[in-house]
């Protein structure tokens, strides 16, 4: 388990690093369940960067700093963990549990029930959330040309 980490609200100087972290993680981790064409489009279109920047401008983006570098990010939007990522080079070190615990803490301070979604094909994320005590809320209805997602819920 990690020994030192800080979860803090992202500031303007963090934005580029957070966008690069997301692109690296999507590129390395999402191809197996989204396919090469979808991942390439999402990264090259700027959609990933736009998603993070849009939430950053609303004050929803938090970063996980460890060993003087940003190793993870989460987006909290209402009672929802909209996005959570650990940089590909820092996965399987316990940082995901640290970031998820802080996100839960922040949301449970305001909401009794919290939620998140993940792609139905993202078996690593599904296993992680279940191991952290999240319950499947069910499969969400997929929109055309959009991969199916699973909702997870947790109650305070």
Regions found by a protein language model. Give the residues of each.
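Conserved active-site tyrosine of GNAT-family acetyltransferases
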Residues: 129, 134
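Conserved acetyl-CoA pyrophosphate-binding loop and the N-cap/start of the following alpha-helix
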Residues: 90, 94-102
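Conserved GNAT acetyl-CoA-binding A-motif
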Residues: 107-118
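Conserved beta-strand-loop-alpha-helix junction that forms the acyl-donor binding cleft
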Residues: 116-126, 142-148
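Conserved N-terminal entry element of GNAT/NAT acetyltransferase domains
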Residues: 1-16, 154-156
């Amino acid at each position: 388990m990690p020994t030192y980490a800080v979860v803090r609200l992202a500031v303007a100087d963090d934005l580029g690093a957070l966008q690069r972290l997301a692109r690296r993680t999507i590129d390395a981790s999402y191809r197996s369940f989204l396919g090469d064409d979808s991942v390439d489009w999402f990264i090259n279109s700027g959609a990933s960067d736009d998603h993070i920047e849009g939430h950053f401008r609303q004050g929803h983006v938090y970063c996980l700093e460890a060993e003087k570098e940003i190793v993870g990010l989460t987006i909290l939007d209402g009672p929802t963990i909209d996005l959570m990522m650990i940089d590909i080079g820092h996965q399987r070190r316990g940082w995901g549990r640290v970031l998820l615990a802080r996100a839960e803490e922040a949301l449970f301070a305001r909401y009794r029930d919290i939620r998140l979604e993940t792609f139905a094909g993202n078996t690593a994320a599904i296993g992680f959330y279940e191991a952290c005590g999240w319950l499947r809320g069910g499969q969400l209805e997929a929109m055309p040309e959009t991969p199916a997602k699973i909702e997870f819920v947790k109650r305070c």
